[in-house]
Amino acid sequence: MNDHSNTNWNWSVTGVAIRDGKVLLARHTYGGGKGKWIIPGGYLENGESPTDAVKREFLEETGVVVDVEDVIGIRCGEKNWYLAFRVQWVSGEARSDGDENDAVEWMDINEAMGREDVPGLTKALVQCALNGRGLEEIPFETQHGGTLWGVAPSRHE
């Protein structure tokens, strides 16, 4: 497992990569998700942006390089938040990291949506990615730093 001593445990990210009617899933090896096929993701490292974190997590966990397209979901809890992105495959062959997962594959979307070992959250986020709508990064200099995400009219007109 990764050493998360330099990790902000309150902020995490995930991404949904869909290519040729298939979604990239990894079979988790520990915790409550052990044996479940999930979308890649993890915690932000200190000073890391959410978009950089999701790119890093995909590369570490699956060997796949992705570009971030838009935000498709936000889960806010009492002590944490979780951003879900739609991501686009750029390069790389899917492979297990041999640590956090023991298998990685491009799974047919219909198969994934019907499997009991694919959690509801993963299915919900795959459906969000398929809907074709999401929040985009909006070029805007924020007073306190960070990134503004919103619906860009030019994309959705």
Show which residues each predicted segment covers.
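Charged phosphate-binding loop/patch that engages nucleotide di/tri-phosphates or the phosphate backbone
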Residues: 128-157
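Short, solvent-exposed loop/turn elements at beta->coil junctions and helix N-caps
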Residues: 3, 71-75
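A short linear hydrophobic-aromatic micro-motif
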Residues: 25, 67-72
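Unchanged
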Residues: 44-68, 77-128, 151-157
